[in-house]
Amino acid sequence: MVERLLPGLERRLKAESAGEVKFDRFTRGRYATDASHYQITPIGAVIPRTIEEAERAIGICRAEGVSVLPRGGGSSQAGQTVNDSVVIDCSKYLTRVLEVDVAGRRVKVEPGIVLDELNRQLKPHGLWFPVDISTSSRATIGGMTANNSCGARSLRYGNTRENVLSIDAMLADGSTAHFGPVAADLSDVPESSPLRGIAKDLFALGAREADEVAARFPKVQRRVGGYNLDALIPGRNDINLAHILVGSEGTLAFSKAIELKLSPLLGKRTVGACHFGDFRAAMDAAQHIVKLAPIAVELVDATMIALARDIAMFRPTLEAFVRGQPAALLLVEFAEADWDENLRRLKRLHELMDGLGFAWDKGGAKFGGVVDVLDPKLQAAITELRTAGLNIMMSMKDAGKPISFVEDCAVPLEHLADYTSRLTDVFAKHGTSGTWYAHASVGCLHVRPILNLRLDKDIKAMRAIAEEAFAMVREYKGSHSGEHGDGIVRSEFNAPMFGARLARAFEEVKDRFDPNGLFNPGKITRAPRFDDRSKFRYGPNYHAQAMRTALDWSAYPGAGGGFQGAVEMCNNNGACRSLAGGVMCPSYRVTRDERDVTRGRANSLRLAITGQLGPEALTSDDMAETMKLCVSCKACRRECPTGVDMARMKIEVQAARAAKHGLSLRDRLVGWLPRYAPYAAKMAWLLNLRDSLPGAAKLSEAVIGMSARRSLPKWRGGVFCDSADTAAPHPRPLPTAPLRSAGGGEQKTSAEIVLFADTFNRYFERENLDAALTVLATAGYRVHVAKPADGSARPLCCGRTFLSVGQVEEAQGEAERTVAALASFVARGMAVIGLEPSCILGFRDEIPAMLKSEAARQLAANAFTFEEFLAREASAGRLQLPLKKIAERALVHGHCHQKAFDAFGAVEQVLKLVPELKVEAIESSCCGMAGAFGFASDTIDVSLAMGELSLLPAVRKAGPDTIIVADGTSCRHQIHDGAGREAIHVARVLAKSLA
């Protein structure tokens, strides 16, 4: 990691600016990358709390002769947001909506507000900002403006430029100017305004270059390369000087406030999923489909379909609307105000496909047809699938990845089929292939050839492919940059694309605004070579150090048994920076700090294992701080489209740190809980005094770091007893269906099952296990309670607490005991059922990763949560439970691991078996308790803040008669402490219904 250290600048910024100033190595490493393949270490980062603080920091940098890089979500794919500069991160604090004019359909915002967050605030007014880009959950308005972003529905709404009304900007000399509509003679611009001189010079340049602009600017809707000189052509009545800043990639000024044009919310829509047996046929059909005036036409190719089928969160969506094995899909959306008109257009789409000769019963290139999608929920799921396109493509686990550099070309629709065919041939010539998706409606398809940028031959191939592709685009009068901008990737090619004369004009614009290169130098003008490997994430000296890992990473390439490859799966797309919906990433949603998001942690890990953060970085205090607020919720395992499993990676970090530094007293008490619990339970009355004896809680905080503000779980003197099996009062006459097996085959059936009694329910909430036994026995099952195979008196344990503090060897020992105890039951075809999600789902995740044995894989294949097992039996018509009505409302919180393993739906399904029970799921992220995390004095504030994101307010709003349901022991504890309500396990709800 190349560094430029300026300690004097750091001291001055800290002394004179009230914002957060961070020049440490870990922070600079986290800001060294964006969603491109580049890595350039910044000088430092400033996170201003106000616009005035941002201006002050920029002024200091100007005085010190240091450039600045305004940054939003850092989701650029072309390298716009990396530079050897001081980063001005607008995304944490500069997020206010300044003005809303509902009648005028206008809004003014600060640059750091995220698009989805803005639209959430606008929704009650029936309005939205309609540039609906795929990264809307983390892209900021400032970043979108700097990039001139386009959305899937640009056929109707255009790009960002067409929706920006004005910009208040700080100029390079420190002055402020209002960029907006102006008269051609500048009569409405005061003589004293710094804008007047700039505008006069820009108009002169526009007049001089008008003919060249007319001749050289691409004639396609999607063109965001270079500066918008076409906005300066004289004789127009709609000159808006803000449009010269739009698409300027932060190279001309700093946007302080941005005024946007709004549109009415879309109403009900229809979607036609056009299937094609041949990719070229789909490309040729696009030009005909757009004549039906859809709002969007989006491509999904066979590669993306195949990859998405391997991702749990997308598999059900594909199964719902994809027929057969199409080579390509075109998703055609109609959104007129009149519903009947949408249906008529959908009918015309069917007629068009028929007229083009496509039919379901035909083979080859003429296979095809339209699947109607009218259900809004399925439409939303398809949109989620489509917007995750890049990340789905990046889920490939090989060293080669789809690389962004020719992904943004746009060509006229009549040339689209030829262009895609010829570019495919170019890829083949250079020994690779490409994956295609995105905006067929405007001829802007995102294609990324698969390359390994660690290899010199692939870097040479990248150069050759780029030159051939861009030459082809020029031949078709298209644009080499349709929506992702220039950055480092395409700035080098602006001269051949626009011609030398306009390239010089771009330099004149830059120099007029920013003569000393204060703002993001090297983008659009005077750019480096795009294949300069010294600026790559995987530079010429990139090498992962040898390391010993504890878990199985063999599905990935690289050092540490594949740990390197797993870490490198993070492509910095920033999906983990989402602020709402799903679970990922709860710590970031509280702190808004790049350190505390999955992307930031993955970057820190990558830099550490490759020696770029200095020796011993993996076990350093800085790395411990980086991992500190990760609650191991596993949301990233499911919701990160590239499958970055930070919870599992944290285990490796904890293990390495524990091996080097040992454990604190608090960590020992947490990790060894299963070992001392049998003895502690005998002193339950004494241990429980901690919460009632004056001063005891504060003493425990001082000695072991358990917060005095948090109650501790109550030990039970009468613990759950597993000395005898439970026979069903009415044994089932029929066996259950075949269970799963690790090899995919069927095992023998059994009406007997095994209950795993976890440490938490055994010693703190035995009523849950008692209720589960009652329910299962009443349903006709013979229940075996799992006991050690060697006859030991020490109960079984999944090893979860040991893993949480990095004691992997101890966890492996517990896992081996558990697998041995359950092996004979699994071999006899019995399901293994657990109540605590983090324990039983560990059977499917960490235990196979630790033991790497066939017995562990067989156990994983037959381990179920309590609700999963009952839901499966109910769906098959085999569940026999005489449930009585409960005419109440049940508010249900899903455990993070249930959501990560798609097990939460079973919770809702089982509760709905209770007659008259009204079941409602809480749309919540992590509860924030996360085992010991919520008890620790140094993390309790973040723990409670996570709960306040959605869970605790929802519980407080619930009526006193509402049943609060939560399967996780930590979740129940958080609800108790944070909302003063008692939550219960599903097993107790069902037992109540049986009473």
Predicted regions and their residues:
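Terminal amphipathic helices with adjacent charged low-complexity linkers/tails
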Residues: 258-265, 283, 291-400, 434, ...
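Iron-sulfur cluster-binding electron-transfer modules in prokaryotic oxidoreductases
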Residues: 514, 521, 528, 647-735, ...
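Flexible inter-domain linker/hinge segments
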Residues: 117, 189-233, 353, 513-586, ...
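Ferredoxin-type iron-sulfur electron-transfer modules and their immediate structural context
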Residues: 395, 399-400, 475-480, 487-629, ...
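N-terminal flexible segment immediately upstream of the FAD-binding catalytic core
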Residues: 1-63, 73-105, 134, 157, ...
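N-terminal glycine-rich flavin-associated loop
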Residues: 13, 36-68, 86, 90-135, ...
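A glycine-rich phosphate-binding loop feature that marks nucleotide/adenosyl-phosphate handling sites
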Residues: 27-30, 76-79, 135-142, 221-228, ...
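C-terminal substrate-binding/cap subdomain adjacent to the FAD-binding core in PCMH-type
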Residues: 36, 146, 154-385, 421, ...
